[in-house]
């Protein structure tokens, strides 16, 4: 019944719609060059988005936005917590945890708050913080997960704290402009 209703809504809105099983969807996504909207139920979307982000880079680079039917938003890092890094941290061991998805979840929420409140300054801050993350990585400063897959020559692998400090330094430079 729900699938039939979704199909009817897509036809009404002139969106191409077809239903497929999860194994077929995974195969299609892995071969695809993109260019489509992929609507999934919560669990399927969670599993499949984790698979795609891991296959094409790092799960720690993906955020998630949940939108309720009545227009409420929740921004989160798609990967949840990084439990094994947390346990290493508790033992006093150094970690190289990529915090980009967590930062982007925060900036998404800040940007939305700025939009709702009409605070362009807050929206601009969120934009600059995201740009600072990207620039820091493009400048070759990154966590271990990114260093393993980058094409940037001689990346500097930073631990969690130093990576955040590097982003902060980049952001501070951008805020002065």
State the predicted function of each range:
Residues 1-7, 11:
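Single conserved hydrophobic/aromatic residue that forms the stacking wall/gate
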Residues 12-35:
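A structured beta-alpha segment of the ubiquitous adenosine-cofactor-binding alpha/beta core
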Residues 14, 23-24, 50, 131, ...:
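Sparse, context-dependent recognition of short Cys/His-centered cofactor- or disulfide-binding micro-motifs
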Residues 29-128, 135-136:
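Glycine-rich phosphate/nucleotide-binding loop
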Residues 91-97, 112-177:
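Internal helix-turn-beta structural module
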